[in-house]
């Protein structure tokens, strides 16, 4: 398994629309970051590749929806290099989404507070507004991800097999 952590903030269109409110975003080199990600993913020999960023690419919730900047700039890279899971937060919900034309499992991890109300969309495998956390376990030929609510109760699990 190999983990790749990226800063998604400068890839979000909304932050570029208000430069005075988000001045640091304008200074970040997104071309360099995405080039690094492409290079590292292309060299990876890992059975399981997980990319982790703060903002979800795809999300179904009352206050948020899919992020166009990430769909344009990040998602094609994840698909090309057959990333198994993209894990994000920001939305304060549990979500597991898949796209018919993508090998990527898109996961939104919940939070310890301020749960929000997700909306089950056509690509949603699971969603919940409960607070909680996720656990990833990796074996020789299987990766399991479990969503656990704030009471410590597993509420959803999925597997990816080689």
Predicted regions and their residues:
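Metal-dependent phosphoester/phosphodiester hydrolase catalytic core
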Residues: 1-120, 125-127, 135-162
């Amino acid at each position: 398994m190999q983990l790749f952590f990226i800063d998604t903030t400068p890839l979000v269109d909304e932050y570029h629309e208000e430069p005075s409110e988000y001045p640091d975003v304008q200074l970040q080199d997104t071309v360099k970051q995405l080039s690094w990600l492409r290079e590292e993913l292309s060299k990876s020999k890992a059975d399981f590749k997980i990319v982790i960023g703060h903002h979800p690419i795809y999300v179904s919730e009352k206050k948020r929806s899919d992020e166009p900047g990430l769909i344009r700039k990040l998602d094609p890279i994840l698909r090309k290099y057959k990333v198994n899971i993209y894990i994000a937060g920001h939305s304060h919900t549990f979500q597991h989404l898949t796209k018919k034309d993508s090998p990527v499992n898109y996961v939104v991890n919940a939070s310890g507070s301020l749960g929000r109300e997700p909306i089950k969309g056509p690509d949603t495998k699971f969603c919940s507004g409960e607070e909680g956390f996720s656990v990833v376990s990796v074996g020789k030929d299987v990766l399991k991800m479990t969503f656990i609510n704030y009471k410590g109760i597993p509420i959803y699990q999925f597997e990816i097999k080689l």
